[in-house]
Design a protein with these regions (language model features):
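Active-site acidic catalytic loop and adjacent metal/ATP-binding pocket
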Residues: 37-50, 54-55, 88, 188-235, ...
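Juxta-kinase regulatory segment immediately upstream of eukaryotic protein kinase catalytic domains
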Residues: 1-26
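Active-site activation/catalytic loop segments of kinase-like enzymes and analogous catalytic loops
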Residues: 233-266, 280-298
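ATP-binding pocket architecture of kinase catalytic cores
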Residues: 48-146
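All-alpha amphipathic helical-bundle segments outside canonical DNA-binding/catalytic cores
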Residues: 267-279
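ATP/Mg2+ or Mg2+-diphosphate-binding catalytic cores
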Residues: 3-5, 168-169, 286-361
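A cross-family kinase active-site recognition segment
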Residues: 121-178, 199-201
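Conserved N-terminal boundary motif of the eukaryotic protein kinase catalytic domain
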Residues: 27-32
Length: 361
């Protein structure tokens, strides 16, 4: 019999995972285990006698053991500080990360508590509460230390590597690729020109767009720290700015977010000045993430309309906030949005949220 054909990204049986969870954790009877979505990782909603949880099964090779241990250490640090986050659950023997043998290789699995409540509604009041929660995480991790190594959210991570993934998709549009490269250089020079000692640095969530949280009463509970790492806090703040755009509702959310953040923690002038730069970095990083993961998500949706949308947004943002504009957008900058990745991945990729909630760039 021929050996099994190689696999790059399998879907683990929810029924088998339920049995494994019941045997491995002190959850009592596991009554349901359902796949929530596939994205950067696979997330399963777990219903058990001792409560609701979320199981994250990492893609093979997506994170190293040390990188996962860093995330776990940060979450447990936040838990000790009393910050509302979805916490990792340890097995009776003390292990928090398990490795499951999948056809494509070992896949890490971590069980988390479920964040209570519902998704935020995007109102000014809830954006204000969200800003307070972001500030509380930054404040609580000022003294976070760990021996585990994690990638930094630096310009190599946010620009250099994403651009390397983007280039093959824009070879037929060299003027547009050059425009993005030039804008990335503006970001690099702009960040370098800011007084380094005045930029707040430390632990960052890396994905504070507003959807990785639930609210119950006055409490906002954060989850999904898979993009976390040491970096500029201005980038963390800029992700929210990028997410909601500049229409009237977006501006109201941004103002409320800043008000909430400042009620818990100050924001320096250098950090505010860096936000427009990091909005561009976020837009480029996300497109690089999409381009780098076509083996699992497909590539047909990375079409000209997709790149038109990015160039149009970058051109408008640069003209308004950074001066000048990218020199070329091949063809008409389409107002139509690309179809986006497969529906199963959409909850993990914010750019493909419903049209009313998509970021502009």
């Amino acid at each position: 019999m021929a050996p099994p054909f190689p696999v790059t990204y399998s879907t683990l049986s929810a029924e088998a995972l339920a049995a494994w969870l019941e045997a491995s954790y002190e959850l009592g009877a596991v009554t349901a285990c359902r796949l929530l979505h596939r994205g950067l990782n696979d997330s399963y909603l777990v219903e058990a006698a001792r409560g609701r949880h979320v199981l994250r099964v990492y893609r093979a090779g997506w994170r190293t053991a040390d990188e996962i241990a860093y995330e776990v250490a940060a979450l447990e640090h936040l838990g000790r500080k009393g910050v509302a986050v979805a916490l990792p659950v340890r097995q009776p023997g003390g292990d928090v990360v398990d490795w499951l043998p999948a056809p494509e290789g070992s896949r890490a699995a971590v069980l988390f508590t479920h964040a209570p409540g519902r998704e935020l509604d995007g109102s000014s009041e809830e954006s204000r509460r969200y800003g307070r929660a972001v500030a509380s995480i930054h404040a609580a991790t000022d003294d976070f230390e760990t021996g585990h190594r994690r990638f930094a959210l630096d310009l190599d991570h946010l620009l250099t590597r994403p651009l390397a993934a983007i280039r093959p998709f824009l070879r037929h549009r060299p003027a547009d690729l050059d425009a993005i490269e030039r804008l990335a250089d503006i970001v690099r020079r702009g960040v370098a020109a800011l007084p380094a000692g005045e930029l707040d640095r430390g632990f960052c969530h890396g994905d504070f767009h507003g959807d990785n949280a639930h609210i119950e009463g006055d409490t906002v509970t954060m989850f999904d720290f898979d993009c976390c790492g040491p970096g500029w806090r201005a980038y963390d703040i800029a992700v929210f700015r990028w997410r909601w755009g500049e229409d009237e509702a977006g501006e109201a959310r941004w103002a409320a977010f800043l008000e909430g953040y400042r009620s818990e923690r100050p924001i320096g002038e250098a950090d505010l000045a860096a936000v427009p730069l990091f909005v561009v970095a976020r837009a480029i990083w996300l497109r690089g993430l999409h381009a780098a993961n076509t083996a699992d998500w497909g590539r047909s949706w990375l079409n000209d309309a997709y790149w038109d949308r990015l160039l149009k947004g970058l051109r408008e943002w640069q003209a308004k906030h950074l001066g000048g504009e990218p020199e070329s957008v091949s063809g008409a900058a389409s107002a139509a949005l690309p179809e986006g990745p497969p529906a199963a991945a959409r909850e993990a990729i914010v750019a493909d949220a419903p049209a009313t909630r998509r970021p502009k760039l």
